[in-house]
């Protein structure tokens, strides 16, 4: 089954900005996250959204995707009917052909050279507050580690791995082939030792000759204050072990932040709505506003209208890179009373008689705008 277009997956245009891509990812990742959405297929959709975001959020990967799509540009013409693989199957690579004709030899990676281990990824779900303030956490991940029985050699204790008698330890075989240019020598991965350059006659019973076993490893992770949904933390050296003495890979912890019932977050800023009674809005009041840092008193001036915005400086989230602190923005919503008693209704009627039914100057300006809109002015 062919992959869907990454832009289509996120529901954005090809000219979408980084912010638009990030917002689309945050919305869809919350929608399809397995912890939230239990519907069949949501897990695959979550993976698809995540894969699309990882490509389109990286400038280099996005540029490569825009040019080549899902095709790997490093594969050349591979898989197009020349016998399989990116090196034209039976013909071998052009490097082999021309190096055999003109001498010198193409450079190939030494199979016995040290290589860095593979990177690992772990998804961690955080509460809204945990993401804002950070925390210490212990996670458990499955990963390959060096076999303690054979100390990573793959050979049964008391025996040793031998140099491959077929390739002489190089991990490659020279195969003579006929080409349109004549007979050339093509180098292939040794099929006897799978390119390792070693042969194990008596394999370790614990790891089966691989030299590695899969274990669950506990790792302590320090989550910095201010991480946001979709961001990732790199833990150096906690990936898969290296090959042939190479360094281990890294662990990337990807954060999924649960939504909050009262607060919303945009970057380092926090947003919330505060209800006011008609009396509070008309007469003014001092109210208590919940923040991530505790309750804060806010003076509401008389005559405050629905939609009025207030800002509490420094009451947002700490910037994850240490660049200051966000603010908390409060939007006022005046609540219309319901289920009034007869006495309350009489009081409001008297108030209406005293104040009149005509809107004040501020409301008049609003109604004037509405009238002009209808007239097309």
Curated annotation (Swiss-Prot):
- Where is the secretion signal located? none
Q: Whereabouts are the CXXCXGXG motif repeats? A: 147-154, 164-171, 190-197, 204-211
SMART domains reported in the protein's UniProt record: DnaJ (SM00271)
One example of the protein's molecular function in GO is: unfolded protein binding
Q: Where does it reside?
A: Cytoplasm
Binding positions for Zn(2+) 2 per the UniProt entry: 164, 167, 190, 193
**Biological processes, Gene Ontology terms:** chaperone cofactor-dependent protein refolding; DNA replication; protein refolding; response to heat
Q: By its UniProt entry, which CDD domains does this protein fall under?
A: DnaJ (cd06257), DnaJ_C (cd10747), DnaJ_zf (cd10719)
Cofactor annotation comment: Binds 2 Zn(2+) ions per monomer.
Q: Which Pfam families match?
A: DnaJ (PF00226), DnaJ_C (PF01556), DnaJ_CXXCXGXG (PF00684)
What's written under domain?
Answer: The J domain is necessary and sufficient to stimulate DnaK ATPase activity. Zinc center 1 plays an important role in the autonomous, DnaK-independent chaperone activity of DnaJ. Zinc center 2 is essential for interaction with DnaK and for DnaJ activity.
Q: How does it assemble?
A: Homodimer.
List the NCBIfam families. DnaJ_bact, PRK10767.1, PRK14276.1, PRK14280.1
Provide the family line: Belongs to the DnaJ family.
Q: According to its UniProt entry, what is the function of this protein?
A: Participates actively in the response to hyperosmotic and heat shock by preventing the aggregation of stress-denatured proteins and by disaggregating proteins, also in an autonomous, DnaK-independent fashion. Unfolded proteins bind initially to DnaJ; upon interaction with the DnaJ-bound protein, DnaK hydrolyzes its bound ATP, resulting in the formation of a stable complex. GrpE releases ADP from DnaK; ATP binding to DnaK triggers the release of the substrate protein, thus completing the reaction cycle.
Question: Could you tell me which HAMAP family the record lists for this protein?
Answer: DnaJ
What is the protein name stated in its UniProt record?
Chaperone protein DnaJ
| Species, as recorded | Bacillus pumilus (strain SAFR-032)
> What's the source species' lineage?
Bacteria, Bacillati, Bacillota, Bacilli, Bacillales
What would be the name of the gene that encodes this protein? dnaJ
